[in-house]
């Protein structure tokens, strides 16, 4: 197998995956939950104000952070950094990097849409009347770059350490930019992905005030329903996913297990509205086409599409229109994972990329949870009802965020 892609850059292998998500705390657990199309939405009791109209979310199931963190780390970090660090540790363990790894050639690229805002919210609540009594680690906890920097500190990675804030596209942006750095020789390896922990009173209230959230408090497991005719808003989730990316030739030379490859990436901006997508999907479609071109592929080469699919009226319709434009009305099978996990904000794109790669490798795509009938069914081939067998082929994974941020990845299963 050649070490270079069609453009002469280094190929980018995925050699490690770690997840902490509502669907499960390992890639296999998450994949099985997605295959079952089981929603993880449930009532939550961590919201301080009774006036918050939405009382449910998708939370990471219990695990043992103390197995990953020192007591000092646990005292100094907040939840988003904890989830990111634990997912990163699993990805490193999966990748088993060489002992002679060059730290200056290994980086961390991480996306987050909310960052440390939950810590600032808690500090304002608990210490608003006595600000000098706030924890000494308040500022480091609230910095958006804390998760990436803590990961770099933990593993001694001294290469590029960058945090991306492209709203709900943040995790996908981080993966794509990490792949570019490896492709063009800036890094040999990178831990890349996304994380967010947005299930808090202020954040949930803010989304609810925008009328962006589902109000199905009496039936939360039916609330997230991407592309379904009865969708009424998204469900907030939390979580992190980190992937170890590596120069293909170096991974093969050391006998690493290769889970797949990032072959294409593109990003652009609608430049249309601060929270709404352009309804005709033209700019998002251009982003998809650019990602395919970056991978040296045509639309017919794609085995399936992992849609952003938030379960909102505007986003799902605009994305369906964009997919229709990109594929010229010949849509491959389209799935969307947020029916299971809700929306992890900056963590969603990274988790979905990891699971999309698994689906492409296995050749079995999950049905979209809770989706029965769709007004977009004439635009795209939605996978509903039961999992669908697909050919082993590259997958296009989409992420779109507030501000008109679009990011698309093309991932290929291992040869």
For every predicted segment, state its role.
Residues 24-25, 119-122, 200-206, 272-275, ...:
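Short acidic, glycine/serine/threonine-rich loops at helix termini
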Residues 1-9, 95-111, 124-136, 153-161, ...:
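Structural signature of cysteine-dependent C-C bond-forming condensing enzymes
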